[in-house]
Amino acid sequence: MLPRHTDPIAAIATAPGRGAVGIVRVSGRGIGPLVEALCGRALRPREATYLPFRDAGGQAIDQGLALYFPAPHSYTGEDVLELQAHGGPVVLQLLLARCLQAAGEADRATGRPRLPGLRLARPGEFTERAFLNDKIDLAQAEAIADLIDASTEAAARSASRSLAGAFSDEIHRLRDALVHLRMLVEATLDFPEEEIDFLRKADAHGQLAALQRTLAEVMGRTRQGALLREGIKVVIAGQPNAGKSSLLNALAGAELAIVTPIAGTTRDKVQQTIQIEGVPLHVIDTAGLRESDDEVERIGIERAWQEIAAADAVLFLHDLTRAGQPDYEAADAEIAARLARMAPAHVPVVDVWNKSDRAEGSAAAGQGGVATASASGRAAAVRLSARTGEGLDGLRRVLLDIAGWQSAPEGIYTARARHLEALRAVDMHLMEAAAQLQCDGPALDLLAEELRLAQQALNAITGEFTSDDLLGVIFSSFCIGK
């Protein structure tokens, strides 16, 4: 059990800085006396009341709306008070301080503190309370953070579906089927003297096979949801003046990186998140790769190689106007050799031939798009002009293919890497269970254990079996007041 989860808590629930409206939120059990002290009257549940907010001396701090949500019909499942005032940081700090002060003051009716133990909330603690009070499960709690952090419309919509329970419903259906299968195995173990073969009569083989098929479908949708949330990291690399910064600007649709004819203009990485069909791509422009005597440029080049080593995909940019020049091709070959050593084996390296609009007569020049051969021996290359935009759609298609994106299916929900890991664990345990069922005289105790472990992995997704350490990591990523 998480520590101090019964303390009443308070926090500013809106983002730091100035705004038209700011909210101070209080959650706890039995906060009625504090509500009356702060608002000067009892409030009707779930109705907005316009009133002045006053300090301990009766002086007005501000005027605004107060809303009272008695348990269990609130965000946290506890009594909740929200004070909506003008969004200046000083006003909100004064309101928050007044909440903490009034909680410790003696109530006139009882002579006891109005809300003893009221403290500032930790990041994510209001949502943590909602989880602990069964208002939401863990996957829905994560969806709240994903909705707040969504960088694309598709990511926001998928997070909203997860918050509504779409992902959790799929997990619960898998769990129910798994529990039924476990019941058959446990019955066979518990009543060995019975003549009924529970497993054969109930077609345990067929049930397990159907469960594995459903799991495969859920894993496919989960991979797509994780992609919408996480995106992929794409590094643009190549020699100086190949057009790396121009390509970043073209993909982003904005002048993010400085472009000049001077080699070595880019000294450090420039990063921008773009979206293609709702998939976030974290594109990084790097320093031109070459031997340099300039200390600052050398640092930038080393950082470029570090980014390449951590990339999900690398765009190796070539200058079509210099194709066929021995020195240029030799330098490209050296970069290609180091890419083969530095980039992880599973990371695709795409050859991108730039400046097709200026390469008339070049053997490699063309109309733009995806070519059929690659100068560095890889399967395909992309030919384009970052200046005119010719061929960019072909590159976008290649990037979506690398990401593993399929056209967005209806009802896709957001997901996280830990969800995929849990589902892979379920898949592994179900495969072990299937192997046991295939044996003559299966070891029922081993079969039962594999099914138990599969259910445990499913429960970890929704938080029905989750370590306190994991909960701490998840909720600490929220902002204070959420």
Swiss-Prot record:
Location in or out of the cell: Cytoplasm
Keywords on record: Cytoplasm, GTP-binding, Hydrolase, Magnesium, Metal-binding, Nucleotide-binding, Potassium, tRNA processing
Positions bound to GTP: 241-246, 260-266, 285-288, 385-387
Positions with a binding annotation for (6S)-5-formyl-5,6,7,8-tetrahydrofolate: 25, 82, 135, 482
Keyword Nucleotide-binding: yes
Keyword presence, Electron transport: no
UniProt GO MF annotations: GTP binding; GTPase activity; metal ion binding
Protein name, as recorded: tRNA modification GTPase MnmE
UniProt subunit comment: Homodimer. Heterotetramer of two MnmE and two MnmG subunits.
Sites where the protein binds Mg(2+): 245, 266
Family: Belongs to the TRAFAC class TrmE-Era-EngA-EngB-Septin-like GTPase superfamily. TrmE GTPase family.
Cofactor note: Binds 1 potassium ion per subunit.
CDD domains linked: trmE, TrmE_N
Major localization listed first in the record, in broad terms: cytoplasm
Chain ranges of the TrmE-type G domain: 231-404
EC number: 3.6.-.-
GO-annotated cellular components: cytosol
Residue ranges of the TM segments: none
One GO term (biological process): tRNA wobble uridine modification
Function in brief: Exhibits a very high intrinsic GTPase hydrolysis rate. Involved in the addition of a carboxymethylaminomethyl (cmnm) group at the wobble position (U34) of certain tRNAs, forming tRNA-cmnm(5)s(2)U34.
Any matching Pfam family: MMR_HSR1
Residues the record lists as binding K(+): 241, 260, 262, 265
InterPro entries with a match to the protein in the record: G_TrmE, GTP-bd, GTP-bd_TrmE_N, GTPase_MnmE, MnmE_dom2, MnmE_helical, P-loop_NTPase, Small_GTP-bd
Species assigned in the record: Paracidovorax citrulli (strain AAC00-1)
Cofactor or coenzyme needed: K(+)
HAMAP family tied to this protein: GTPase_MnmE
